[in-house]
Amino acid sequence: MLVDGDQLNLQSSFNISIRARHSLSGLDMTLFNIQANEDQDIAELALEIDQLFGDSAVDANHLYETEATGTYREADCTPRDCAARTGWHLLGNADMRIGLIDTKVDQSHPALKFAEITQRDFVQGRGKRPLSHGTAIASILVGQQSGLYTGLAPDGQLFAASVFSNLDSSGETASVESLVRALDWMVENRVSVINLSMAGPPDTVLEKAILRTIANGIPVIASVGNDGPAAEPMFPAAYPSVIAVTAVDANNRVYRKAVRGAHLDLAAPGVRVLAAEPGGAYGPVTGTSIAAPFVTVIYGAGNTGTKPPSSYQKTAIDLGTPGFDTVYGYGLIHVAQTPGEK
C-alpha cells in the first residue's frame, strides 16, 4: 500500500498486520507491506484506506521478470555500432545520471570495474541475487574496456538498484515493494532518466510511484516485453506516462517475440547486441530489455537540457505502416538536430 506523506496511524485505524513500513523521502510517500485478515475484502479495504488517507493505492505485491535472452549466434554489433543509426552521437552525456532498476550488477567485470556506479540492494529476504541481466544492461549503458568494448555513455554516472532475487518458488523476480523503494532512491539521487527492463502485471501501487517519479521530472523508460505479438500489454511499459520500447534487429525488423500494442512508443536496437556477462566475458543478448537502454541514454542526455525529450517521437524514423503503428510505435528512435532532420 502507498499513501501520501508520512503516515503513522495506519495499523490503529484498520484491523491489519504491518509486515514492513518504508518512509519514502524522495517521493514524499509511505509504503506499507500489509497483511489483511482472511475475512477482509481487499477492494473494500482499499476503499476505506483511500477515504481516510486520500489519494492512496492498495494492491498485491506483484512480481516482475526481466525481459532478455542470450543468443547462441554471434553478435551483430557493439552498443555504439548498433546505436549509430539512431543519431545518438549528436547528444553529449557528461552530466547524465542514469537510473537502472534491475538485477545486481557485476562491478568486477572489466567493462564495469572503472565505471562510476553507485549500487544499492532493495531486495527483502535472503534469496540469491542474480547478475546476468543487470550486468548486460549496465555494460550497454556505461561499460568501457580499453580497446575491447565501449557502452553508450561511459562517462555517465549509473545508479544501479538491485531488486531481483532468485527463489525456487518464483524464479528470478522483483516485487513491487522493491521496485517502489528503488524509484524513491532514484528521485533522491536526482537521476536524469530511469531504465526499467522488466515486465509484469498492472499494479496500482507501482503506477502511483511511477507517476510521482515522472512528476519529479524524471522520464521512465520500459521494455514492452517478450511474450509475443499476441500477448496482452505488459507493465510498467503499458502505463501511458511510461516510454514503451520494442526491439528491432540490424535491418530494423521487429523482434519476433516483442509484445505489440497501442501503448508502444519507440523502437531501438535489441537483437544480438554485444554485452557483458558475469565473470568477465562478453556475449550477444536479445530482447526488448536490450532495446530500452538505447532509448534511456537518449532521453537522459536530452533531459540535461540538450534537447526536450518529448520531441523524440517527432524525429523517430518511421518503420512499418506509415505513421504510428502497433508494431514499431512512432518508429526507430533518432536524435535529429531539428524536427524532421534525419
Which stretches of residues belong to each language-model region?
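Subtilisin-like serine protease catalytic core
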Residues: 88-98, 104-118, 125-176, 239-240, ...
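Catalytic-core environment of secreted peptidases
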Residues: 101, 110-112, 117-119, 247-289, ...
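Loop/turn elements at helix/coil->beta-strand transitions in domains of secreted/extracellular proteins
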Residues: 54-56, 94-97, 155-158, 188-194, ...
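Structural detector of well-ordered beta-strand residues that form the stable sheet scaffold
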Residues: 59, 123, 159, 219-222, ...
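Hydrolase catalytic cores
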Residues: 141, 161-163, 270-342
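Protease zymogen maturation seam
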Residues: 40, 44, 50-105, 109-113, ...
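Inhibitory N-terminal propeptides of secreted protease zymogens
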Residues: 1-67, 193, 340
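Substrate-binding/access-modulating region of protease and related hydrolase catalytic domains
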Residues: 164-240, 251-254, 260, 278-292, ...
